């Protein structure tokens, strides 16, 4: 079973028609500076390891200039997180995120269900593990039909998405569900889904 680093996951999502920030992976401080120059504005420099809590581990930083991106990449590439050395950084455009959401598709192996399950919350971000269970909405998906639009609208409404945004969020979730099914994923998690405008 393949496990993706963040940049690999974003490449995969982009190929599936999902919106992702402009960015590229870099293996050296010099490459990070080059990518930041190509982006042409403030960037996020994000260490690439298969571990949670990267923000708290200090391997996700913001830079205003290519020179800052180079210095931060040098610092991040010298670190180890949960025993894993950081060998690459993702340098991507810094977005002005107004609101964060959480979404995952997993296999529900309970005896009653044995089906894909969507988990969605309007409370995404670094501390998703501490979010109250009542704010994490779960829905068992019919394996034959996938996530249907009206079910996606329903779960978004329950999560507190504004009525005028229900169609957009539901469309996003149904596209993700289709990718999850198409590639026979065991798990597809996005934390966080960022919204630049509210």
Where are each of the predicted segments found?
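A conserved helix-loop-beta module that forms one wall/lid of the active-site cleft
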Residues: 1-41
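ATP-grasp fold ATP-binding core
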Residues: 6-8, 12-13, 38-54, 83-97, ...
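Glycine-rich phosphate-binding loop of ATP-grasp-fold ATP-dependent ligases
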Residues: 20-23, 45-72, 102, 115, ...
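Active-site cofactor/substrate anionic-group-binding motifs, chiefly glycine-
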Residues: 38-44, 62-86, 123-126
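Hydrophobic alpha-helical hairpins/lids featuring a short glycine-rich hinge
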Residues: 82-140
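Cap/lid and interdomain-hinge subdomains that line or gate substrate/regulatory clefts
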Residues: 124-169
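A long amphipathic alpha-helix within ATP-dependent nucleotide-binding catalytic cores
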Residues: 151-193
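Conserved small/polar residues in nucleotide/adenosyl-binding loops
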Residues: 196-198
